[in-house]
From Swiss-Prot:
Belongs to the endoribonuclease YbeY family. Disulfide bonds: none annotated. Its EC number is 3.1.-.-. This is Endoribonuclease YbeY. The gene is ybeY. Gene3D superfamilies: Metalloproteases ('zincins'), catalytic domain. It comes from Anaplasma marginale (strain Florida). Its main location: cytoplasm.
Length: 154
């Protein structure tokens, strides 16, 4: 089960059909990573800087907004609740401009990034970052989205 909650109405303007798009990307991740068979629960909250600032402060002790926060709940098993993914509308919009990528592409990237975090992937250590980025880039490529870690040629 995938549940998407819209905390901030601006998401509709930013990405069109945010619930449909988010569910599609999460389903895609579950399928590509061969996790669909477990029928896990994943919750996505499309929020804003204010909520992510509050959560980041409360749970990580970092007093600034961030693009995505993930909270992992249970290990992968049949019917498990994998966790929650929170995205900030303002961060996604601003970062897509800074990186010169389509908002929708960056939105998809951050959903994939959050999904990998709730599956236990991390990027704190160089080896972990290489593994996680390779998965992200591979999944994004299958969605027709270029590698976000390689600067765009001008």
């Amino acid at each position: 089960m995938i549940e998407v909650n819209i905390h901030t109405r601006g998401w509709y303007k930013l990405v069109g059909k945010p619930k449909t798009s988010a569910k599609r990307v999460i389903r895609f991740c579950l399928s590509e990573l061969d996790i669909t068979k477990y029928d896990p629960k994943v919750f996505v909250v499309l929020a804003n800087d204010a909520l992510l600032l509050e959560l980041n402060s409360q749970y990580r002790g970092i007093h600034k907004a961030t693009n995505v926060l993930s909270f992992s709940y249970e290990k992968l098993s049949p019917g498990c609740c994998l966790g929650e993914i929170y995205l900030s509308m303002e961060r996604i919009a601003e970062e897509s401009l800074e990186m010169d990528v389509a908002v929708r592409s960056h939105f998809f990237h951050m959903l994939i990034h959050g999904m990998l975090h709730i599956l236990g992937y991390d990027h704190e250590e160089p080896e972990e970052a290489i593994t996680m980025q390779a998965l992200e880039v591979g999944l994004l490529a299958k969605l027709g989205i270029r590698n976000p870690y390689v600067p765009r040629e001008t």
